[in-house]
């Protein structure tokens, strides 16, 4: 039979078999379990749904009709149950299932279907529209050859992507290790060191000293004024020097009109999230701004380079110190109060050395980010 364009509904049938999940012993797949654009199932435990599910068989193709721009398409290799937000498409004998999967994953097809959605908050596509989309249907042997070729290419690209992702991971790991060695004095070659008696930093250069955090910083709680921007904070990068945009602010501060309970931070001030300090949520501000009441804000009490202490406190040994000082029954309830933070013993290099170390740490991380960005761009070209 020569190749032709056909409406999808003439080559695949939308199945409508639904059951209460309690009435089936089939494994369940939600849209959240399908990786966008690849059709792969994501690893990890899957939630068990309440209510009704759709039933599918081996060879059926699942298509996520909710937010179709996410391109959630999966070719079933075993029978199961899925979210009713997925269309269950059963190819006719003239349409190869793997070929149909790739047809539906075509970016132009996804754009076409996405343009048809209805509903502002929960945009959905309908089978009425999707079924009327025209698809190119070559001979079955050609379909199989196309699908096999795309399977091979996808596998090859997946291997390349995995290799590059490992490179990025290793790059960041090495950069963080280099920073940890810098801030703890492990890279000071040819100089005498002394034992500290502390597990988290056993030795330091002999010309460094040790002081508790409370001797280097003191807690401040300057009330926020309305004109100060709300700053973004990350467990990965510390305090950002940019103001949250309207969308981020609405999401992160929950539309609080009166932010008088927010705390001022000034350039050089240290701030940490009481509930996430054990994850490394600590940073130094470079601008005037405001942070959530969930943050402890501390001002230097002596002439020191605060950025050095940001890098220091974000290393694994000092994150562990903050975790040990936190109070709470479980991890998600842990809180690090100033009374415990102030007791942490911190190394104190000479001021100029603090500045030099912080500058080197910034260069290490910036170089890693630059190389990682090049790798990510190369992945996008695959």
Regions picked out by a protein language model, each given a short descriptive name:
Residues 9-19, 23-58, 197, 211-267:
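Sequence-specific dsDNA recognition surfaces
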Residues 1-21, 132, 136, 140, ...:
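Non-catalytic DNA-recognition/assembly elements of restriction-modification systems
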Residues 25-43, 61-83, 87, 98-102, ...:
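Short, ligand-facing micro-motifs at secondary-structure edges
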Residues 94-100, 303-309:
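Short, conserved charged micro-motifs
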Residues 50-51, 76, 120, 132, ...:
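A structural connector/turn signal
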Residues 164-167, 171-174, 178, 185, ...:
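Hydrophobic stripe of amphipathic alpha-helices that form coiled-coil interfaces
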Residues 66, 80-87, 118-144, 275, ...:
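A short glycine-rich beta-alpha junction/loop motif
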């Amino acid at each position: 039979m020569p190749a032709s364009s056909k409406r999808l509904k003439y080559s695949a049938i939308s199945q409508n078999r639904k059951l209460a999940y309690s009435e089936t012993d089939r494994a369940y797949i939600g849209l959240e379990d399908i990786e966008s654009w690849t059709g792969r199932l994501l690893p990890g435990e899957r939630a068990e749904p309440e209510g009704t599910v759709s039933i599918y068989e081996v060879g059926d193709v699942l298509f996520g009709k909710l937010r179709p721009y996410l391109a959630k398409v999966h070719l079933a290799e075993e029978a199961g149950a899925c979210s009713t937000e997925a269309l269950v498409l059963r190819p006719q004998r003239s349409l190869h299932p793997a070929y149909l999967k790739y047809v539906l994953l075509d970016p132009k097809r996804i754009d076409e279907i996405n343009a048809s959605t209805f509903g502002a908050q929960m945009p959905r596509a309908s089978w009425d529209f999707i079924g009327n989309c025209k698809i190119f249907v070559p001979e079955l042997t050609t379909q199989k050859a196309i699908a096999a070729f795309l399977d091979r290419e996808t596998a090859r690209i997946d291997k390349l992507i995995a290799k590059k992702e490992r490179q990025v991971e290793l790059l960041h790991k090495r950069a963080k290790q280099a920073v940890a060695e810098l801030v703890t004095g492990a890279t000071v070659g040819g100089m005498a060191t002394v034992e500290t008696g502390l597990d988290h930093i056993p030795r330091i250069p002999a010309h460094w000293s040790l002081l508790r955090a409370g001797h280097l910083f003191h807690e401040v709680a300057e009330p926020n004024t309305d004109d100060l921007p709300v700053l973004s904070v990350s467990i990965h990068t510390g305090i950002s020097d940019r103001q949250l945009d309207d969308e981020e602010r609405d999401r992160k501060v929950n539309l609080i009109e009166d932010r008088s309970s927010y705390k001022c931070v000034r350039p050089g001030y240290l701030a940490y999230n009481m509930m996430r300090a054990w994850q490394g949520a600590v940073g130094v501000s470079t601008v005037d701004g405001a942070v959530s009441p969930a943050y402890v804000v501390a001002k230097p009490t002596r002439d020191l380079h605060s950025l050095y202490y940001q890098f220091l406190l974000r290393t694994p040994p000092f994150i562990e110190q903050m975790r040990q000082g936190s109070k709470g029954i479980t991890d998600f309830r842990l809180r690090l109060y100033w009374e415990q933070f102030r007791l942490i013993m911190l190394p104190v290099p000479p001021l100029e050395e603090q500045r030099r170390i912080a500058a080197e740490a910034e260069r290490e991380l910036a170089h890693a980010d630059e190389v990682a960005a090049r790798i990510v761009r190369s992945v996008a070209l695959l």
